Amino acid sequence: YSFTDKQGRTVLTRQMNNSEEHDTYYIYNDKGNLCFVLQPKYQESADLGKYAFQYEYDARGRCTKKILPGADFVEYTYNAADQLVFSQDGNQRAQATKKWTYYLYDKFGRLTEQGECTNKSATSSPVVYIHNYYDGYGFINGTGFTDSNYKLTEAQKAYGKGYQTGSVISIFGDSKKIYLMYQYDIQGRVVKTVQNNLLDGLDVTETTFTFSSNPQTVVHKNTYKENGTQKSITETYIYTYDYADRISKVEHTLNDTKVVLSENTYNKLGQLVNRSLHGASADIMGYAYNIRNWLTRIESPNLILKLNYGYSAGGGNIASMFWKSGEEGRQKYTFTYDGLGRMLNADHLILGQQDEDDDDWGVTTGLMSIQTGRQIEETPLARENAFTERVTEYDKNGNILKLVRYGQTGANSYGVIDNLTMTLTGNRLNRVDDASTASAYGGGFEFKDAVKQDNEYAYDANGNLTQDLNKGIEDIQYNCLNLPRLVKFKDQSTITYTYAADGTKLRVEHKIGNSTTRTTYCSNVIYEGGTAKCLLTEEGYVSLDDREYHYYLKDHQGNNRVLVNKNGGVEEINHYYPFGGVFASEENVQPYKYNGKELDTKKGLNWYDYGARQYDAALGIFTTVDPSSEKYYPTSPYVYCGGDPINRIDPTGADWYKDSDGNYHWAERGGDIAEGWTWVGSSVSIEISKSKYVNYYENGGIKIRNDKPNFSRMESYWSWL
């Protein structure tokens, strides 16, 4: 439900969890500016500081103060042209010498400089973080742009007018800077980028385009110094397209050795039906869909995955998932949801063996095939609830209050390994108590309840996690982008992060006991201790010590299920709990796992790096506030995917839009949004009959239509293809 006033402003949105109302209220001032948004939890506990978004405005209607739930206020100052020139958040205000972020613009309103200063004065000791250049290339004669790769002919400079041509970006905690240059062609397409890296080298990327402006060739050269010797890595991508401009083949050349990285085949409906890796020698992936264009099956020699959908008021959520990885046995999850589409139960089965041709895959007697409705033959069942995960209670903002997780407790035994009760202060986690006495066998994935006290978790003024006593973390420090700078453990072990001022992660250093390891990220090349370790490709990675190709076999969410070599040999198998924990995996040769994100397990950290935030899969929460939380008002800014990790993935940056005909579309932010479409949000509740609703969420491009064809529900899942 959405309620509006006489001026068409939304004053209430209501989502129904069966008969329970989840209400979000919107309050405006006399000038029509939004002043308060009261989350559903506010209706139970009227605390503005914990459960309200708050805004203040000046006489010109510009927001001068903003408060997110559980965070200190952010202050904004504008110039006469209504441009933001200063901002200050809670962490900047809490420093001994208060800091402000400042912004400078050119006469066209383009950001030219951003940094920090000590007060709102042009002479207040500014520290420049980002300096942008436009229209020309005079800057390449300055400091930092001395390499010949930055030099352009007069003809090459001619097409930079109207575009950003370069940047100088500071590196937090390092005296070095990133010097970046863009070169354009006559159509305004970037044909060359040059930037330096932390290893005294450069990353140079040159691109040619097809007539329809799709990349045709991409040549990337990475140079670096290793033990004082200059070395280089050169890779080339060649893209081939079919008549509909869909990628049909991707070739990859690494230092003059060419392979066919992938080949795609599509059916007459435009659906991807086959995908071969490494010229089909690594794997051939087949894809099947139902009449609604939803993905139902992925099948290859090393990964089989089947999805069944429920057709109740849940709106087509995934009801069960079968899979088989490598030579291992079949497994199944059966999912149930509450009225808001949040996961309640993910019941796990290890299935008995069954004929490969039986499409219904070993389900116990009494269950009905979701697709056919017929009775399924009984088959041997090896184990129930081996790796079940259940959320037994949410609050009205979607925060998990109780979670039960099953796992392996012995060589041949399984049981409850986590029986968690979360205590919150507002949306912030304060304490976790584990009632289970069993532990995961062999040091497997589980929550470690190391202490039992109040305030096990602490936060700074911006809502960033600064203490996790259950992991032995006594302090977490952040840079001005709310990205971690230092994680300090009780035993004085540390993890130090190096970021550029634009948020790019450049280096991570682990000091654990007497051991120090350093990982450096230079574009898609990863270095360990200054030695090139691997090169990430569109389908996996190349290990640079032996120049061998490795390929990820992904499921519908982009989770890396199986790692194979160029000959199809299985090198790693990963199985996941719904919220991302890794269980019962074979080998562990690389860190990219759930959603394809990097997992850091050192010192028991167990964080997934999602770029803007770190994610703790044991608790199903992020460590910092969602930077886009104002687009998801009813939901806690810490929860993962609104409590639905089955049908959603967080990093897609997608939302619901409504067109002029009243149809709802799922579209990428920044993508092709048609004229007349209006933003709805991450979810939409539609009345299908009196007092009955269908809630649609971030789970793909379903289109509630009048008379037009449906979009693919799995569209957002396939953004990684």
Where are these regions (language model features)?
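Repeat-solenoid scaffold signature
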Residues: 64-126, 242-296, 321-409, 476-510, ...
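A residue-level detector for well-ordered beta-strand positions
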Residues: 2, 26, 55, 76, ...
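Beta-turn initiation residues at beta-strand->coil junctions
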Residues: 2, 6, 12-18, 24-26, ...
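Extended repeat-based solenoid scaffolds, especially LRR ectodomains
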Residues: 1-4, 123-185, 291, 305-314, ...
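Short, small/polar residue-rich loop motifs at catalytic or cofactor-binding pockets
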Residues: 20-22, 49-51, 70-72, 97-99, ...
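Short turn/helix-capping motifs enriched in Asx and small/polar residues
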Residues: 567-582, 603, 611-613, 617-687, ...
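A motif-centric feature for acidic-aromatic and gly/ser/thr-rich catalytic loops and repeats
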Residues: 36, 42, 211, 305, ...
